Amino acid sequence: MSIYETAQQLAQQIKESDEYRDFIVAKELMKADEGHYKMIRDFQMKQFEIQQAQLFQLDISQGKQQELERLYSLLSLNPAAREYLEAEFRISRMINDVQKIIGEAIIDVLPLGFEDNDQPQILA
């Protein structure tokens, strides 16, 4: 079996997984409720902004962090929104685990220095 066939099998297994199916169902439920869908999108945008700031080692205002926490608290009161966030976490964790397994298998083909967990310096 070729590596491409194996990758296709992996993609199919991901689509057949409980994590994937649960996420798709939760996503469709969220899309059906425009108000909660907008809140989820707002939460995700704020979360992304904070993650980007952390990636570039920028200061994150306490207000932004508190706003994200407040929005998360509001979302978790709604069962459909809470289920969506939990399903999103589970599918993300599965994908990250698969990426980690592949990454560990190909460490020998990484550019010089990266195999020692050296990180390139980010210039801000």
UniProtKB/Swiss-Prot annotation:
InterPro entries: Com_YlbF, YheA/YmcA-like_dom_sf. This is UPF0342 protein DSY2926. Pfam families: Com_YlbF. HAMAP family: UPF0342 (MF_01526). Belongs to the UPF0342 family. The lineage of its organism: Bacteria, Bacillati, Bacillota, Clostridia, Eubacteriales.
